[in-house]
Design a protein with these regions (language model features):
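Extended non-catalytic scaffold regions that mediate assembly and binding
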Residues: 1, 5-13, 64-67, 112-118, ...
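Short terminal alpha-helical segments
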Residues: 6-50
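Extended low-polarity, hydrophobic cluster-rich segments
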Residues: 17-22, 41-58, 75-89
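Amphipathic alpha-helical interaction segments
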Residues: 26-29, 54-57, 62, 101, ...
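Extended intrinsically disordered or low-complexity segments
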Residues: 60-78
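Amphipathic alpha-helical binding modules
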Residues: 75-126
Length: 126
């Protein structure tokens, strides 16, 4: 049972959704990234996804503002983050109010597989 307010039953598993969100960024790297680069990119995508969910659904913009602060990131980093924010707010992902909690990349038969857990950004009712 979903604890999310949208109760959108069309949502796929969060791991599938997150992979679809991340894939264009991985593909833009040209060749398959090394494990370190891949993990760094996943961490950035994870942070942007969650910051946008908090900003758009809870009204908490401090996390997104920090990610977009040019004094805390390189110009290329800000461009990447802006692109990810735009992608999260695109028609494909905008109605997904799930936070991405823990995630892991596992190797299954030589293929990387993404596992992720979803959680609600909304405060629990007392």
């Amino acid at each position: 049972m979903s604890v999310l307010k949208s109760k959108n039953t069309k949502h796929k598993k969060i791991s599938s959704t997150f992979l679809a969100f991340v894939s264009p960024s991985l593909e833009a790297m040209g060749m398959p990234p090394g494990e370190r680069e891949r993990d760094t990119l996943l961490k950035v995508c994870w942070g942007v996804w969650n910051a946008v969910v908090y900003a758009d659904y809870v009204g908490r913009t401090d996390l997104l503002n920090k990610l977009l602060d040019p004094s805390l990131s390189s110009p290329a980093g800000v461009v990447l983050i802006n692109g990810l924010v735009e992608r999260k707010r695109s028609r494909r992902f905008a109605d997904d109010d799930r936070l991405i909690g823990d995630y892991k990349i596992k190797d299954v038969n030589g293929e990387p597989r993404l596992w992720a857990e979803a959680s609600s950004p909304y405060p629990k009712s007392a």
